[in-house]
Regions:
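A residue-level marker of the well-folded mature domains of exported/periplasmic proteins
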Residues: 4-278
Length: 278
Protein backbone atom coordinates (compact mmCIF):
# COMPACT_ATOMS: atom_id res chain seq x y z
CA UNK A 1 0.00 0.00 0.00
CA UNK A 2 1.12 3.53 -0.68
CA UNK A 3 1.00 6.65 1.47
CA UNK A 4 -2.62 7.73 1.81
CA UNK A 5 -4.62 10.70 2.94
CA UNK A 6 -7.94 9.78 4.59
CA UNK A 7 -9.93 12.29 2.55
CA UNK A 8 -9.31 10.20 -0.58
CA UNK A 9 -11.22 7.05 -1.44
CA UNK A 10 -8.84 4.12 -1.15
CA UNK A 11 -9.46 0.59 -2.36
CA UNK A 12 -8.69 -2.41 -0.20
CA UNK A 13 -4.93 -2.95 -0.38
CA UNK A 14 -4.17 -5.58 2.22
CA UNK A 15 -1.98 -3.16 4.16
CA UNK A 16 -0.63 -5.13 7.14
CA UNK A 17 1.31 -2.46 9.05
CA UNK A 18 0.25 1.18 9.23
CA UNK A 19 1.87 4.33 10.59
CA UNK A 20 -0.34 7.30 11.39
CA UNK A 21 1.70 10.45 10.77
CA UNK A 22 1.78 13.43 13.12
CA UNK A 23 2.12 16.10 10.49
CA UNK A 24 1.57 19.39 12.31
CA UNK A 25 5.23 20.32 12.71
CA UNK A 26 5.18 19.51 16.41
CA UNK A 27 8.03 17.93 18.35
CA UNK A 28 7.01 14.46 17.26
CA UNK A 29 7.67 15.02 13.57
CA UNK A 30 11.22 13.63 13.68
CA UNK A 31 9.86 10.68 15.64
CA UNK A 32 7.31 10.10 12.88
CA UNK A 33 9.98 10.12 10.20
CA UNK A 34 12.24 7.75 12.14
CA UNK A 35 9.33 5.43 12.90
CA UNK A 36 8.20 5.25 9.29
CA UNK A 37 11.74 4.53 8.10
CA UNK A 38 12.02 1.65 10.58
CA UNK A 39 8.59 0.25 9.77
CA UNK A 40 9.20 0.40 6.02
CA UNK A 41 12.57 -1.34 6.34
CA UNK A 42 11.07 -4.09 8.51
CA UNK A 43 8.08 -4.56 6.22
CA UNK A 44 10.27 -4.78 3.12
CA UNK A 45 12.52 -7.34 4.80
CA UNK A 46 9.56 -9.50 5.80
CA UNK A 47 7.62 -8.94 2.56
CA UNK A 48 4.75 -7.19 4.31
CA UNK A 49 2.75 -4.26 2.99
CA UNK A 50 3.16 -1.05 4.99
CA UNK A 51 1.48 2.32 4.62
CA UNK A 52 1.80 5.78 6.10
CA UNK A 53 -1.47 7.64 6.64
CA UNK A 54 -1.45 11.42 6.85
CA UNK A 55 -4.41 12.90 8.78
CA UNK A 56 -6.15 15.97 7.39
CA UNK A 57 -5.19 17.92 10.51
CA UNK A 58 -3.61 17.52 13.93
CA UNK A 59 -6.71 16.52 15.88
CA UNK A 60 -8.00 13.44 17.63
CA UNK A 61 -10.93 13.23 15.22
CA UNK A 62 -8.61 13.26 12.22
CA UNK A 63 -6.29 10.70 13.82
CA UNK A 64 -9.17 8.33 14.51
CA UNK A 65 -10.38 8.77 10.94
CA UNK A 66 -6.95 7.73 9.67
CA UNK A 67 -6.94 4.72 11.99
CA UNK A 68 -10.34 3.69 10.64
CA UNK A 69 -8.99 3.99 7.10
CA UNK A 70 -5.99 1.83 7.99
CA UNK A 71 -8.23 -0.81 9.57
CA UNK A 72 -10.48 -0.75 6.50
CA UNK A 73 -7.36 -1.35 4.40
CA UNK A 74 -6.64 -4.47 6.43
CA UNK A 75 -4.00 -3.22 8.87
CA UNK A 76 -3.46 -5.61 11.76
CA UNK A 77 -0.76 -3.50 13.39
CA UNK A 78 -0.89 0.28 13.72
CA UNK A 79 1.94 2.49 14.95
CA UNK A 80 1.16 5.84 16.56
CA UNK A 81 4.41 7.84 16.80
CA UNK A 82 4.16 10.71 19.25
CA UNK A 83 2.75 12.01 22.50
CA UNK A 84 -0.07 13.72 20.60
CA UNK A 85 -1.60 10.26 20.05
CA UNK A 86 -2.04 9.39 23.74
CA UNK A 87 -5.79 10.06 23.96
CA UNK A 88 -6.29 8.69 20.45
CA UNK A 89 -4.60 5.44 21.44
CA UNK A 90 -6.77 5.24 24.56
CA UNK A 91 -9.92 5.25 22.42
CA UNK A 92 -8.60 3.23 19.49
CA UNK A 93 -7.39 0.30 21.58
CA UNK A 94 -10.97 -0.22 22.76
CA UNK A 95 -12.69 0.45 19.45
CA UNK A 96 -10.41 -1.91 17.49
CA UNK A 97 -9.77 -4.84 19.81
CA UNK A 98 -8.61 -7.08 16.95
CA UNK A 99 -5.90 -4.61 15.95
CA UNK A 100 -2.55 -4.31 17.73
CA UNK A 101 -1.14 -0.86 18.49
CA UNK A 102 2.31 0.51 19.24
CA UNK A 103 2.36 3.96 20.83
CA UNK A 104 5.77 5.60 20.58
CA UNK A 105 6.68 8.34 23.02
CA UNK A 106 3.62 8.12 25.27
CA UNK A 107 1.11 6.13 27.32
CA UNK A 108 -2.63 5.93 26.50
CA UNK A 109 -4.91 8.04 28.69
CA UNK A 110 -8.27 9.77 28.55
CA UNK A 111 -9.00 13.49 28.79
CA UNK A 112 -8.94 13.27 32.61
CA UNK A 113 -5.47 11.67 32.58
CA UNK A 114 -6.71 8.22 33.54
CA UNK A 115 -3.97 5.97 32.15
CA UNK A 116 -4.64 2.49 30.75
CA UNK A 117 -2.68 0.43 28.24
CA UNK A 118 -4.96 -2.11 26.59
CA UNK A 119 -4.20 -5.78 26.03
CA UNK A 120 -3.68 -4.98 22.34
CA UNK A 121 -1.33 -2.04 22.94
CA UNK A 122 2.35 -1.59 23.77
CA UNK A 123 3.72 1.79 24.81
CA UNK A 124 7.33 2.88 24.43
CA UNK A 125 8.78 5.84 26.31
CA UNK A 126 12.35 7.06 26.26
CA UNK A 127 14.81 8.29 28.87
CA UNK A 128 15.74 11.55 27.15
CA UNK A 129 17.81 12.60 30.13
CA UNK A 130 20.24 9.75 29.45
CA UNK A 131 20.72 10.74 25.80
CA UNK A 132 21.06 14.37 26.85
CA UNK A 133 23.61 13.46 29.51
CA UNK A 134 25.81 11.65 27.00
CA UNK A 135 25.58 14.59 24.59
CA UNK A 136 26.69 17.09 27.22
CA UNK A 137 29.41 14.82 28.54
CA UNK A 138 30.82 14.12 25.07
CA UNK A 139 30.75 17.79 24.06
CA UNK A 140 32.93 18.83 27.00
CA UNK A 141 35.21 15.82 26.60
CA UNK A 142 35.70 16.88 22.97
CA UNK A 143 36.93 20.26 24.14
CA UNK A 144 33.85 22.44 23.85
CA UNK A 145 33.44 24.72 26.86
CA UNK A 146 30.85 27.24 25.68
CA UNK A 147 27.66 25.28 25.24
CA UNK A 148 24.10 26.19 24.35
CA UNK A 149 20.77 24.44 24.72
CA UNK A 150 17.78 25.48 22.61
CA UNK A 151 14.60 23.54 23.30
CA UNK A 152 11.28 23.81 21.50
CA UNK A 153 8.49 24.13 24.03
CA UNK A 154 8.83 23.44 27.76
CA UNK A 155 7.28 19.99 27.71
CA UNK A 156 8.56 17.09 29.85
CA UNK A 157 10.62 15.26 27.22
CA UNK A 158 12.38 18.43 26.08
CA UNK A 159 13.11 19.36 29.68
CA UNK A 160 14.58 15.91 30.27
CA UNK A 161 16.90 16.37 27.30
CA UNK A 162 18.02 19.72 28.70
CA UNK A 163 18.51 18.60 32.29
CA UNK A 164 20.53 15.60 31.15
CA UNK A 165 22.66 17.81 28.90
CA UNK A 166 23.48 20.14 31.79
CA UNK A 167 24.35 17.26 34.11
CA UNK A 168 26.52 15.53 31.52
CA UNK A 169 28.45 18.71 30.80
CA UNK A 170 28.93 19.29 34.54
CA UNK A 171 30.25 15.76 35.06
CA UNK A 172 32.77 16.07 32.24
CA UNK A 173 33.84 19.51 33.48
CA UNK A 174 34.48 18.09 36.94
CA UNK A 175 36.59 15.29 35.49
CA UNK A 176 38.63 17.50 33.18
CA UNK A 177 38.81 20.65 35.28
CA UNK A 178 37.39 22.67 32.39
CA UNK A 179 35.45 25.86 33.02
CA UNK A 180 32.17 25.41 31.16
CA UNK A 181 29.62 28.08 30.30
CA UNK A 182 26.10 27.08 29.24
CA UNK A 183 23.31 29.21 27.77
CA UNK A 184 19.86 27.65 28.21
CA UNK A 185 16.93 28.83 26.06
CA UNK A 186 13.48 27.76 24.88
CA UNK A 187 12.20 28.82 21.46
CA UNK A 188 8.53 28.47 22.38
CA UNK A 189 7.83 26.57 19.18
CA UNK A 190 8.65 23.36 17.34
CA UNK A 191 8.56 25.07 13.95
CA UNK A 192 11.43 26.16 11.75
CA UNK A 193 11.47 29.97 11.72
CA UNK A 194 13.59 33.08 11.32
CA UNK A 195 12.99 33.81 15.00
CA UNK A 196 14.59 30.54 16.06
CA UNK A 197 17.47 31.14 13.69
CA UNK A 198 17.99 34.60 15.21
CA UNK A 199 17.92 33.12 18.71
CA UNK A 200 20.64 30.64 17.78
CA UNK A 201 22.61 33.28 15.89
CA UNK A 202 22.62 35.43 19.01
CA UNK A 203 24.08 32.59 21.05
CA UNK A 204 26.82 31.96 18.51
CA UNK A 205 27.58 35.68 18.39
CA UNK A 206 27.99 35.65 22.17
CA UNK A 207 30.61 32.94 21.90
CA UNK A 208 28.62 29.71 22.10
CA UNK A 209 30.54 26.99 20.28
CA UNK A 210 27.93 24.26 20.02
CA UNK A 211 24.13 24.22 20.50
CA UNK A 212 22.08 21.19 21.48
CA UNK A 213 18.85 21.70 19.48
CA UNK A 214 15.82 19.75 20.74
CA UNK A 215 12.31 19.96 19.38
CA UNK A 216 10.87 19.11 15.99
CA UNK A 217 11.96 21.38 13.19
CA UNK A 218 13.80 24.02 15.22
CA UNK A 219 16.98 22.07 14.56
CA UNK A 220 16.84 23.20 10.93
CA UNK A 221 16.89 26.84 12.03
CA UNK A 222 19.76 26.24 14.44
CA UNK A 223 21.73 24.50 11.70
CA UNK A 224 21.28 27.47 9.37
CA UNK A 225 22.55 29.81 12.08
CA UNK A 226 25.51 27.50 12.72
CA UNK A 227 26.44 27.41 9.06
CA UNK A 228 26.52 31.19 8.90
CA UNK A 229 28.34 31.62 12.20
CA UNK A 230 30.80 28.76 11.90
CA UNK A 231 29.25 27.07 14.93
CA UNK A 232 28.40 23.46 15.71
CA UNK A 233 25.15 21.63 16.46
CA UNK A 234 24.10 18.54 18.41
CA UNK A 235 20.94 16.95 17.01
CA UNK A 236 18.17 15.19 18.92
CA UNK A 237 15.84 12.18 18.60
CA UNK A 238 17.44 10.66 15.49
CA UNK A 239 20.72 10.83 13.60
CA UNK A 240 20.72 14.31 12.09
CA UNK A 241 24.24 14.27 10.69
CA UNK A 242 22.79 14.34 7.19
CA UNK A 243 21.41 17.83 7.74
CA UNK A 244 24.76 19.58 7.72
CA UNK A 245 28.46 19.21 8.39
CA UNK A 246 27.87 21.44 11.42
CA UNK A 247 26.11 18.55 13.21
CA UNK A 248 28.83 16.86 15.26
CA UNK A 249 26.63 14.21 16.89
CA UNK A 250 23.01 13.44 17.80
CA UNK A 251 21.31 12.39 21.03
CA UNK A 252 19.40 9.44 19.59
CA UNK A 253 16.55 7.67 21.34
CA UNK A 254 16.82 4.26 19.73
CA UNK A 255 13.48 4.42 17.94
CA UNK A 256 14.55 1.87 15.32
CA UNK A 257 15.40 -0.72 17.95
CA UNK A 258 12.10 -0.22 19.79
CA UNK A 259 9.99 -0.43 16.64
CA UNK A 260 11.83 -3.48 15.32
CA UNK A 261 11.56 -5.34 18.63
CA UNK A 262 7.79 -4.89 18.85
CA UNK A 263 7.21 -5.67 15.18
CA UNK A 264 9.17 -8.91 15.57
CA UNK A 265 6.87 -9.93 18.40
CA UNK A 266 3.88 -9.17 16.17
CA UNK A 267 5.03 -11.28 13.21
CA UNK A 268 6.18 -14.08 15.55
CA UNK A 269 2.79 -14.01 17.30
CA UNK A 270 4.42 -13.31 20.67
CA UNK A 271 3.02 -9.78 20.98
CA UNK A 272 2.09 -9.04 24.60
CA UNK A 273 0.04 -5.90 25.11
CA UNK A 274 -0.85 -4.01 28.24
CA UNK A 275 2.77 -3.03 28.76
CA UNK A 276 4.98 0.05 28.63
CA UNK A 277 8.75 -0.05 28.45
CA UNK A 278 11.74 2.24 28.05
Amino acid sequence: CQEKKPEKTVEETGCEIAVIAEGSGEADISVTEATWKSVKAFADEHELAAGKYEPEEASEEAYLKSIQQAVDDGAGFIVLPGRSFETTAYKAQTSYEDTDFLLIYGVPHDEKNNYATGANTVSVVFAEEEAGYLAGYAAVKDGYTKLGFVGGKEIPEIKRFGYGFVQGAASAAEETGAKVELAYKYAGTFEESDEVKELAAGLYKDGTEVIFACGGLIGNSVVKAAEEAGGKVIGADVDQSGLSDTVITSAEKGIDSAVTTVLKSYVNETFVGGTAFN
